[in-house]
């Protein structure tokens, strides 16, 4: 459940900005049918930063309800306050989620020791499997391999979503951790190379609109069929790149609407709708990928 193509699911909203349960079910059904390995609910792509705490919990619980055991659900529970991250995590202790994805604290930029103590505190207060999430471009904080290795010694810290795009991190972390510690890419454009170097999958933005293709890509790579995997990845590469043409999840929500996967591409401020120029670029990427 923690390997292969794991989607960082968008949070669909209606025209007034309320959570759209009908579209959420449609998205979940699409991922079940497409072979997505697991769903991350309310991560960065799910607009965690603009949801209230109540909405955050509601979306995770609705995702569990609507998936109805057909696909594992991972809850996004990161925060830049340790007490808040602990509270979010404990909220889902007996919910049915299979684990939590917890991003490094953002804006306050803790030291490596601060990062260690932050994640240790979360793990000590929940039995749920914890996946660390390192994305310095968004957080301003880079969790280095020696810190990851220290955290990997804690029983329920089972892996990391590594989204630096720096492929050398794979071997650097592998040298310091046990073989059962999961390395997951957080960068679609380099995910295939990441897997070839020893990663076990990707937590993917692209999978929101190319779920079947991303599941196939990961399966081919896991089987060692890199020639076919590369051909598929080459077709998807414009999509990997252009879904970040404007700040994510702006382009991917527009793409989900364009493919009929949800009713609107509504976002909440400070996220704004995709520009006309952006829509042309993303539409072309969808066409190049054979999705339109």
Curated annotation (Swiss-Prot):
Active site: 133, 161
Enzyme class: lyase
Protein origin, superkingdom: Bacteria
Catalysed reactions listed for this entry: L-aspartate 4-semialdehyde + pyruvate = (2S,4S)-4-hydroxy-2,3,4,5-tetrahydrodipicolinate + H2O + H(+)
Main localization category: cytoplasm
Site for Part of a proton relay during catalysis, residues: 44, 107
Keywords assigned: Amino-acid biosynthesis, Cytoplasm, Diaminopimelate biosynthesis, Lyase, Lysine biosynthesis, Schiff base
Positions bound to pyruvate: 45, 203
Record carries keyword Lyase: yes
UniProt cross-references to SMART domains, sorted A to Z: DHDPS (SM01130)
Enzyme Commission number(s): 4.3.3.7
GO cellular component, one term: cytosol
Gene3D superfamilies for this protein: Aldolase class I (3.20.20.70)
Localization per record: Cytoplasm
Similarity remark: Belongs to the DapA family.
Biological function: Catalyzes the condensation of (S)-aspartate-beta-semialdehyde [(S)-ASA] and pyruvate to 4-hydroxy-tetrahydrodipicolinate (HTPA).
Self-association and partners: Homotetramer; dimer of dimers.
Protein's name according to its UniProt entry: 4-hydroxy-tetrahydrodipicolinate synthase
Species classification: Bacteria, Pseudomonadati, Pseudomonadota, Gammaproteobacteria, Enterobacterales
């Amino acid at each position: 459940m923690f390997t292969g193509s794991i989607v960082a699911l968008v949070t669909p909203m209606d025209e007034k900005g309320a959570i759209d349960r009908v579209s959420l079910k449609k998205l979940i059904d699409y991922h079940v049918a497409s072979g997505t390995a697991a769903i991350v609910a309310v991560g960065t792509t799910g607009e965690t930063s603009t949801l209230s705490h109540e909405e955050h919990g509601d979306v995770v619980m609705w995702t569990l309800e609507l998936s109805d055991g057909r696909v594992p659900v991972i809850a996004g529970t990161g925060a830049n306050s340790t007490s808040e991250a602990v509270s979010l995590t404990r909220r889902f202790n007996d919910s049915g989620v299979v684990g939590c994805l917890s991003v490094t604290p953002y804006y306050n930029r803790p030291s490596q020791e601060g990062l260690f103590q932050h994640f240790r505190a979360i793990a000590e207060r929940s039995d749920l499997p914890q996946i660390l999430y390192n994305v310095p471009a968004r957080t301003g904080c880079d969790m280095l391999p020696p810190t990851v290795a220290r955290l990997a010694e804690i029983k329920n810290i089972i892996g990391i979503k590594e989204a630096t795009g720096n492929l050398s991190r794979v071997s650097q972390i592998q040298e310091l951790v046990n073989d059962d510690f999961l390395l997951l890419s957080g960068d679609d454009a380099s995910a295939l190379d990441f897997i070839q170097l020893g990663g076990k999958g990707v937590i993917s933005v692209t999978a929101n609109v190319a779920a079947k293709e991303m599941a196939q890509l990961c399966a081919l790579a896991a089987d060692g069929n890199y020639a076919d995997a590369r051909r598929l990845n080459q077709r998807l590469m414009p999509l990997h790149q252009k879904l970040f043409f404007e700040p994510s999840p702006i382009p991917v929500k527009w793409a989900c609407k364009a493919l009929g996967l949800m009713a609107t591409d509504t976002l909440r401020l400070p996220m704004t709708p995709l520009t006309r120029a952006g829509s042309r670029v993303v539409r072309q990427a969808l066409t190049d990928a054979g999705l339109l």
